[in-house]
Curated annotation (Swiss-Prot):
Residues annotated as glycosylated: N118
Keyword tags: Apoptosis, Calmodulin-binding, Cell membrane, Disulfide bond, Glycoprotein, Lipoprotein, Membrane, Palmitate, Phosphoprotein, Receptor, Repeat, Signal, Transmembrane, Transmembrane helix
Any Gene Ontology biological process: immune response
Bilayer-spanning residue ranges: 174-194
Covalent lipidation (S-palmitoyl cysteine), chain numbering: C198
Interaction with CALM: annotated span: 228-252
Protein name from the UniProt record: Tumor necrosis factor receptor superfamily member 6
Phosphothreonine found at: T213, T320
Modified residues annotated as Phosphoserine in this record: S223
């Protein structure tokens, strides 16, 4: 009986040791299986990075750029069934396992963009700024309008930079001042250019004899000279349009002008004579010569006015000298 109690601790110790070995063996087996599982997962992940994708079954290769997967692979490491993306609306620019293509980018005109390169199955749309717009960022989602310069441009606006404008300075004020002075000086300059030739020609046509020998009585008679004997000479020195313009401005009616024209359709010389005679009859003898000379000068016909004035003045001077000579002869008798 004593021997049994002595052997019992030994038996229990052996059982405990045996159980411990079994547990250790199971733990070791579980650890080994966990390691193998991790190895498998790592292998799968590595294969995924190399182009395998698992959706039901493994596909060995991705769909090429411009295509998408139409269905999953039915056999491990099978080739995928790929179909093209929709041209102009979708694209893929690299190999992939997706069943969808990417949507093409839209170039929003409202944001200052326009299409530079159209979208294809393998390339997205490329946008750029519209004319008179710019974008200075790396990725342009919108473009800004170019600045309009009021005082001049230093650098023109480009696709990537805004316009550089000149600043307003005192030179612009000086320019406006010079322009204003020029506008003020133009009228007197034009007046001198137009009127000075008339004044010079008047001095040239007035000889020394005319300026010194005429007495006050001759000057008075010039304003009351009878133009009837000079009408033909005056008409010959003027064009028909000049005669019409003069008589029209000095009281001859359009009806009378047309009547004289119709009466002398084929003879323009006679038209001029009759028009001047009609004007002279309406005006009368008094101051008719002055009216004629002033009217021609007003119409910028200075040369013609001086020529007619010289002819009449010379004729009056000659008549005066002849009259004086006749009086001297009578006194001698």
């Amino acid at each position: 009986m004593l021997g049994i109690w002595t052997l019992l601790p030994l038996v229990l110790t052996s059982v405990v040791r045996l159980l411990s070995k079994c547990v250790n063996a199971q733990v070791t087996d579980i650890s080994s299986k966990g390691f193998e599982l991790r190895k498998i997962v790592t292998t799968i992940e590595t294969q995924n990075l190399e182009g395998l994708h698992h959706e039901g079954q493994f596909c060995r290769n991705p769909c090429p750029p411009g295509e998408r997967k139409a269905r999953d692979c039915t056999v491990n490491e099978d080739e995928p069934d790929c179909v093209p993306c929709q041209e102009g609306e979708e694209y893929t620019d690299k190999g992939h396992f997706s069943s969808k293509c990417r949507r093409c980018r839209l170039c929003d005109e409202g944001h200052g963009l326009e299409v530079e390169i159209n979208c294809t199955r393998t390339q997205n749309t490329k946008c750029r700024c519209k004319p008179n717009f710019f974008c200075n960022s790396a990725v342009c989602e919108h473009c800004d309008p170019c600045t309009k310069c009021k005082h001049g441009i230093i650098e023109e606006c480009t696709l990537t930079s805004n316009t550089k404008c000149k600043e307003e300075d005192s030179r612009s004020d000086l320019l406006w001042l010079c322009l204003l002075l020029l506008l003020l000086l133009i009228p007197p300059i034009v007046y001198v250019v137009i009127k000075e030739p008339c004044r010079k020609r008047r001095k040239e046509n007035q000889g020394p004899h005319e300026s010194t020998t005429l007495n006050p009585e001759t000057a008075i008679n010039l304003s009351d000279v009878d133009l009837s004997k000079y009408i033909t000479t005056i008409a010959g020195a003027m064009t028909l349009s000049q005669v019409k313009d003069f008589v029209r401005k000095n009281g001859v009616s359009e009806a009378k002008i047309d009547e004289i024209k119709n009466d002398n359709v084929q003879d323009t010389a006679e038209q001029k004579v009759q028009l001047l005679r009609n004007w002279y009859q309406l005006h009368g003898k008094k101051d008719a010569c002055d009216t004629l000379i002033k009217g021609l000068k007003t119409a910028d016909l200075c040369t013609l006015a001086e020529k007619i004035h010289a002819v009449i003045l010379k004729d009056i001077t000659s008549d005066t000298e002849n009259s004086n000579f006749g009086n001297e002869v009578q006194n001698l008798v």
